[in-house]
């Protein structure tokens, strides 16, 4: 039987995609819209405080295309905290006009495919930085879920640990070419959501998403074993831009 990869697990992650009921939003009196925006910004301010204390992180992006209008990406130490944040958002006045589009629940993950020493990895600063990341404030985001194929001779889970390690090492070398251009956060979701992993990419140049994903398609681990869900691409919605975004 093949050996399962051991994982290092960090913060829990929620990707919460919503569409905006603009028609209903436009019917609200201006004063009520402003009050709803102020209430939402107060909630975001709480998220900012948590992030400054390094007890979690968040990102808010508007989504390009028809799959969704807005994304709230939240990182927290526990699943319960994610649920509390989702509930708090749903209780706001603004949420009356935010319709569920898609969501993804996962946990920040590092695997043991790369060789490690005897030191406790959770005490290594670089490992901790990757397991408990402060999300980049880049102009653009790209998210997609993915699986490893389990069909015939292309069954990832029947490969030996050494075979999988070698394939992942080559895959990682491709990713390193984009260091400084793209920041990647991998979250594991086996038993938590419909796919096995979520991939979130951050960059100030959206074209780098296309270049990176395309080049990786030629890696054997992706060409033979990668299966992908829908891609979501968006632009950053800073606190300063929230009032103008919701202005009608």
UniProtKB/Swiss-Prot annotation:
Catalytic reactions on record: Fe-coproporphyrin III + 2 H2O2 + 2 H(+) = heme b + 2 CO2 + 4 H2O; Fe-coproporphyrin III + H2O2 + H(+) = harderoheme III + CO2 + 2 H2O; harderoheme III + H2O2 + H(+) = heme b + CO2 + 2 H2O
Cofactor: Fe-coproporphyrin III
Cofactor remark: Fe-coproporphyrin III acts both as a substrate and a redox cofactor.
Matching InterPro entries: CHDC, ChdC/CLD, Dimeric_a/b-barrel
Top-level taxonomic group: Bacteria
Family matches, as Pfam families: Chlor_dismutase
EC numbers: 1.3.98.5
Active site: 144
Keywords, in A-Z order: Heme, Heme biosynthesis, Iron, Metal-binding, Oxidoreductase
One GO BP: heme B biosynthetic process
Record pathway: Porphyrin-containing compound metabolism; protoheme biosynthesis
GO molecular function terms attached to this record: heme binding; metal ion binding; oxidoreductase activity, acting on the CH-CH group of donors, oxygen as acceptor; peroxidase activity
PANTHER family: COPROHEME DECARBOXYLASE, HEME-DEPENDENT PEROXIDASE YWFI-RELATED
Function (record text): Involved in coproporphyrin-dependent heme b biosynthesis. Catalyzes the decarboxylation of Fe-coproporphyrin III (coproheme) to heme b (protoheme IX), the last step of the pathway. The reaction occurs in a stepwise manner with a three-propionate intermediate.
Official protein name in the record: Coproheme decarboxylase
Taxonomic source organism: Geobacillus kaustophilus (strain HTA426)
Lineage, uppermost ranks: Bacteria, Bacillati, Bacillota, Bacilli, Bacillales
Gene designation per UniProt: chdC
